[in-house]
A protein has these predicted regions:
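Nucleotide/pyrophosphate-binding catalytic subdomain
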Residues: 1-143, 147
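Generic beta-strand/beta-sheet core signal
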Residues: 24, 63-65, 103, 144, ...
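Short, glycine-/Ser/Thr-/acidic-enriched flexible segments
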Residues: 67-68, 84, 96, 107-108, ...
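Internal nucleotide-binding/catalytic subdomain
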Residues: 99-101, 156-159, 164-165
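Surface-exposed amphipathic alpha-helical tracts and adjacent flexible/coil segments at the periphery
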Residues: 142-144, 153, 163-170
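A conserved regulatory-domain signal marking ACT and ACT-like small-molecule sensing domains
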Residues: 168-236
Length: 236
């Protein structure tokens, strides 16, 4: 509950400063439930509650992002890193919005990290899959779960820079123009560990990978890339 005070206080202040704005308590309609030992979005319940909360839309709606409540206990929970973008996406999907705008501190997705590649430039359009891949592999423009709710409803996402509002930004949508360039962008993840389990005794043995991934999952380790030799004598 303590970590949610920043969003709750700041959104209330902004609501007071904007004429015609109404503050909504996201704890009343963003609900989570425990799945695999983690608090994850209770999608169906949340979508129904969002529709009920926004039956009458005011001129401006202010909603604190990131925070939620457990569907069963009512205890305050949160949506994790990037939860504010995720909150906006959840609401946009539930209300069948025409598009979702996310204002951040960059001009959009870049072809590469400008701190590493000085000639990197903003990508005008990306598909949902392309954006998800770049996010999963290090591009910290959008929190990956943000993409899924609007992707299902085919709602475009527009990424804009708060400090450069005139910038074109990046549009994420399903139908993008054909691009002659085979590579849209390059992203990377630092601090990655590669583990290889190998041995001739693995060949033809059923359930080896299940045991490997179960051991990692039981220790809270997420695997994002897998490679297995065709001879089945190693998994990385």
């Amino acid at each position: 509950a303590i970590v949610s005070y920043g969003e709750r206080l700041s959104s209330n202040i902004v609501a007071v400063l904007i004429d015609g704005a109404k503050w909504f308590d996201s704890r009343t309609f963003i609900k989570t439930e425990i799945k695999s030992g983690r608090q994850l979005l209770a999608s169906d319940l949340t979508h129904e509650l969002v529709k009920q909360a926004f039956v009458d839309l005011p001129k401006v709606s202010l909603v604190p992002g990131f925070i939620s409540t457990d569907a069963d206990s009512g205890e305050v929970t949160n949506l994790g890193r990037g939860g504010s973008d995720y909150t906006a996406s959840i609401i946009a999907a539930a209300l069948d919005a025409s598009f979702l705008e996310i204002w951040t501190d960059v001009d959009g997705f870049m072809t590469a990290d400008p701190k590493v590649i000085s000639t990197a430039y903003t990508i005008n359009e990306l598909s949902y899959v392309e954006a998800m891949e770049l996010c999963n592999f290090g591009a910290k423009v959008v929190y990956p779960p943000t993409i899924y709710p609007v992707c299902v409803k085919n709602i475009p996402i527009l990424i804009k820079n708060t400090f450069n509002p005139s910038g074109k930004g990046t549009v994420i949508k399903s139908d993008i123009a054909e691009d002659q360039k085979p590579i849209k962008g390059i992203s990377s993840i630092n601090g990655t560990t590669l583990i290889t389990v190998s041995g001739l005794s693995m060949v033809g043995v059923i359930g080896v990978n299940r045991r490997i991934f179960s051991a990692l999952a039981n220790n809270g380790i997420s695997v994002f890339l897998v490679s297995q030799a065709s001879s089945e004598n190693s998994t990385s």
